[in-house]
Amino acid sequence: MHPPRPTTDLPEDFYIPMALDAPNITALSPFLVPQTHLGSPGLFRAMAAFMFLLIALGVPINTLTIFCTARFRKLRSHLNYILVNLALANLLVILVGSTTACYSFSQMYFALGPTACKIEGFAATLGGMVSLWSLAVVAFERFLVICKPLGNFTFRGSHAVLGCVATWVLGFVASAPPLFGWSRYIPEGLQCSCGPDWYTTDNKWHNESYVLFLFTFCFGVPLAIIVFSYGRLLITLRAVARQQEQSATTQKADREVTKMVVVMVLGFLVCWAPYTAFALWVVTHRGRSFEVGLASIPSVFSKSSTVYNPVIYVLMNKQFRSCMLKLLFCGRSPFGDDEDVSGSSQATQVSSVSSSHVAPA
């Protein structure tokens, strides 16, 4: 693989990070011709099929999350507002980002043009950032409710709404700059989906500073909030457990909480660590060659989160799962288990906290 082309000959709307045997790079524009010089047609078809799978799974799961919360009163707790917010952000990514990518991969180039690329890049980044910050808010809200660092503070609906609004404000702050000249939205990887420009340097777009901004503001800070909040939550629950008799119910609840926390943190890392690692590697290894197809993997991981985040935060919750089954099967669960978090798990304080707060319900 040849090193990337010099940054002195940059088109305004795209950049292909590899040397290409073409006298006029514009003739290979990802907005004009199939990008089969970057990968085989089979690879593009496979990516289109994967994006279609994300759409087919993500739309029903996230739509059901919203509909079930509206339909069942017991799901409309203040701590669940952020899950509806997460579902809305996921739907934005799916309906704009994944759908556009699916069509583009099927055509093997970004057939919708530069303006659509900017719209798709902005919308997908906005939805992704809102989703990312929603995971941090989920963790922090549970820290406030369970650990009670503010004493007798009561978590109200207004606080939940404020948390949701904050995610959209922070998401806009992170995703809007490329629309105004701080970095830019261009086709990435196989040139069939759009995102911030990680590839170029020493130019008018100042991409290096934008990448560092995203790394700090949209990965480091949320990750610190998540690790701190869930770490304190585990410490608090262990302290509660030590004050009680170590019954089988308490031990089971403790294991469930620990497992849920680990899954939540890993879900965040699986979603965003590849994107962050790739962007930082490109910024700090200018001139180093890399497989262009691999540059599509981080985007795939982030778009996949629209499916596995609802699985972690919604389907792993008994109350949400029970309500979804009732909705789908006309009011009765096919398994005959009217799961309710107010059952035997409330035999001890720690088990009650684990089921109704850590796994949001």
Swiss-Prot record:
Cellular component per GO, a single term: plasma membrane
Location of the protein in the cell: Membrane
Keyword Disulfide bond: yes
Disulfide bonds: C117-C194
Biased composition (Low complexity): 342-361
Gene Ontology molecular function: G protein-coupled photoreceptor activity
Tissue-by-tissue expression: The color pigments are found in the cone photoreceptor cells.
PTM annotation, UniProt: Phosphorylated on some or all of the serine and threonine residues present in the C-terminal region.
Membrane side Extracellular: residue ranges: 1-43, 107-120, 184-209, 284-291
PROSITE patterns attached to this UniProt entry: G_PROTEIN_RECEP_F1_1 (PS00237), G_PROTEIN_RECEP_F1_2 (PS50262), OPSIN (PS00238)
Keyword Phosphoprotein among record annotations: yes
Modified residues (N6-(retinylidene)lysine): K303
Alphabetical list of InterPro entries matching this protein: GPCR_opsins, GPCR_Rhodpsn, GPCR_Rhodpsn_7TM, Opsin, Opsin_blue, Retinal_BS
Transmembrane segments: 44-68, 81-106, 121-140, 160-183, 210-237, 260-283, 292-316
Region (Disordered): 338-361
Main location: membrane
Topological domains, Cytoplasmic: 69-80, 141-159, 238-259, 317-361
Domain of life: Eukaryota
Family of this protein: Belongs to the G-protein coupled receptor 1 family. Opsin subfamily.
Stated role: Visual pigments are the light-absorbing molecules that mediate vision. They consist of an apoprotein, opsin, covalently linked to cis-retinal.
Name of the protein in its database record: Blue-sensitive opsin
Protein source organism: Gallus gallus
